[in-house]
Amino acid sequence: MSEQKVKLMEEEMNVYRVQGFTCANCAGKFEKNVKKIPGVQDAKVNFGASKIDVYGNASVEELEKAGAFENLKVSPEKLANQTIQRVKDDTKAHKEEKTPFYKKHSTLLFATLLIAFGYLSHFVNGEDNLVTSMLFVGSIVIGGYSLFKVGFQNLIRFDFDMKTLMTVAVIGATIIGKWAEASIVVILFAISEALERFSMDRSRQSIRSLMDIAPKEALVRRNGQEIIIHVDDIAVGDIMIVKPGEKIAMDGIIVNGLSAVNQAAITGESVPVSKAVDDEVFAGTLNEEGLIEVKITKYVEDTTITKIIHLVEEAQGERAPAQAFVDKFAKYYTPIIMVIAALVAVVPPLFFGGSWDTWVYQGLAVLVVGCPCALVISTPISIVSAIGNAAKKGVLVKGGVYLEKLGAIKTVAFDKTGTLTKGVPVVTDFEVLNDQVEEKELFSIITALEYRSQHPLASAIMKKAEQDNIPYSNVQVEEFTSITGRGIKGIVNGTTYYIGSPKLFKELNVSDFSLGFENNVKILQNQGKTAMIIGTEKTILGVIAVADEVRETSKNVIQKLHQLGIKQTIMLTGDNQGTANAIGTHVGVSDIQSELMPQDKLDYIKKMQSEYDNVAMIGDGVNDAPALAASTVGIAMGGAGTDTAIETADIALMGDDLSKLPFAVRLSRKTLNIIKANITFAIGIKIIALLLVIPGWLTLWIAILSDMGATILVALNSLRLMRVKDK
């Protein structure tokens, strides 16, 4: 498909919310029906998010007609050619109307009531009584109407799915006079579908709860007046006023005030973060302390929380490898069950003199056992639950495929700067070595000189001066010069001062540059610090060390990864060998690669993949973007603060720390284990039930209970992923 055609289709994409999906098969059928609508070029259902993307033109009425088999309700979320999508609260576009249980399942309740009266009549009047039979027939017709409606259509089209199996089984049971069991099959199948829908709704709740995090209105100052307006009407550049205890409604930058903001909704951090002027704040976070004024930087549809919701919903719709296997398996599984059921019903009576009633009954039971409900939902509920749980805890997983891949990772490569370290250099050591100069005076001279340099570590020295209230702007510097590869020099009050490496002072032949002093400098360098000497042509005045501080969590994270069985942890950095070794040894990585350019990091990741197959790379998503893209799973940090991180990586840690990484690994592994357990259990219980055919013990009761039991247990097992905690 040409790029122009793809772009045209994207421009014609309409997004609709869908209410009423009961199973993944129904979602697939709805997608097929929508594709047949004239004017529709393509359609893609996102079962996890309960949405459909329609490429082309189709009315809501046409879409609902395509979903009439399941009584689906459709509402537009984003229509083509609309630059801004505004959905107010009163549209209820994102929320299903809450219907009372008795109304939502009225037919099921009435059919169940008829069964109860049917069994009462059975005990009072007997099995062959007309009243008894009519009560069971009434239950079958009322409770199974929607089932038969779809089942007959599928049968005519030779489209074999679970509803086709159930329809044939119920009709067959009624033909051979098993009214009571046929009605039980109908009711229990309806209950199974209701439970399946409930399970999916529960797993979607984590994302729906994110939608309600950010306030729909905000206090904004316009033309000197403070007014409360809807977030859809707030423009970039508006000043929003947020009082203590209020949630922040929009993304922006603080222009006035100080506060502590709880960012748990976005980053998963439980500890409030201090915020001051020029700091960024996000919609959905809680202003805990001071009153702040925020300049809006993004429209409501572009806020970080909106992007998270959108990406998570897209991720829930992505089919994981396990889901692809299940879908492919189910495609052949259902027809095979139909054939097995036919053979069970026909072969024993024809060739072995068996009773037709007995073996037809056994064949019908095989159809019920063969219903792939549990198998079909084994993966989607797990993926939706896991991705939703991860999002609430500050880990954005962009698809089930990455969730599965992360679970198989045995090697993790870390970019050093901004990942294992904070990425911001700070002054760690400052020692005055000459009694003739005061500490503050010397630091003031150092700062005045560094202020004029282009050295990347100069910002750390200036920041230290500001923190300690050391003035430097009034220091007059003359004849400032950068000494390439050595340091800098300048004249202050008639004295020439030098700041630079030990090599510079060796060349100057400074008298008090001793071997012992040089060893002290090497000790600082071996600690991962950059040591700079300040002095004149005659004497050394002091030494200052600057370093990119290691994150407090880095060492603990590496230990947890090793405990999880990830033995190969590698640090990649452009730093020199000494600095790299100091930091790598401190955090406990198993291998250290230093003095690497971005291309070298990419080449190293490719080399590691050839050796270990599955390699995860974690960085900030900026200068290490090629390596992230080449890895099996690319993980970016600080996703809340940069669009680049979210777009580049397969997984984004929304908070600016590593502590969520072990949680993401544990969650992915648990997801894989639960999916495997679900598939094994769903298939295993059916095999056991089918084996009961051999001695003739399989009944419709056993068949429906095994199917329903498997569905319930698989759903409940999958929902456990919503409770995995970030330890």
Curated annotation (Swiss-Prot):
Function: Couples the hydrolysis of ATP with the export of cadmium. Involved in cadmium resistance.
EC class name: translocase
Organism ancestry: Bacteria, Bacillati, Bacillota, Bacilli, Bacillales
Binding residues for Cd(2+): 23, 26
A GO molecular-function annotation: metal ion binding
Induction line: By cadmium.
Annotated EC: 7.2.2.21
Inhibition and activation profile: Inhibited by the antibiotic bafilomycin A1. Partially inhibited by DCCD, nigericin and FCCP.
Major site of localization recorded for this protein: membrane
Keywords attached to this entry: ATP-binding, Cadmium, Cadmium resistance, Cell membrane, Ion transport, Magnesium, Membrane, Metal-binding, Nucleotide-binding, Phosphoprotein, Plasmid, Translocase, Transmembrane, Transmembrane helix, Transport
Subcellular location: Cell membrane
PANTHER family: CADMIUM/ZINC-TRANSPORTING ATPASE HMA2-RELATED, CADMIUM_ZINC-TRANSPORTING ATPASE HMA4-RELATED
Domain HMA: 12-75
Transmembrane stretches, start-end: 106-126, 130-150, 171-191, 336-356, 364-384, 672-694, 699-721
Gene this protein is translated from: cadA
GO cellular component entries: plasma membrane
NCBIfam families noted in UniProt: ATPase-IB1_Cu (TIGR01511), ATPase-IB2_Cd (TIGR01512), ATPase-IB_hvy (TIGR01525), ATPase_P-type (TIGR01494)
GO terms of biological process kind: response to cadmium ion
Name this polypeptide is given: Cadmium-transporting ATPase
Catalytically driven reaction(s): Cd(2+)(in) + ATP + H2O = Cd(2+)(out) + ADP + phosphate + H(+)
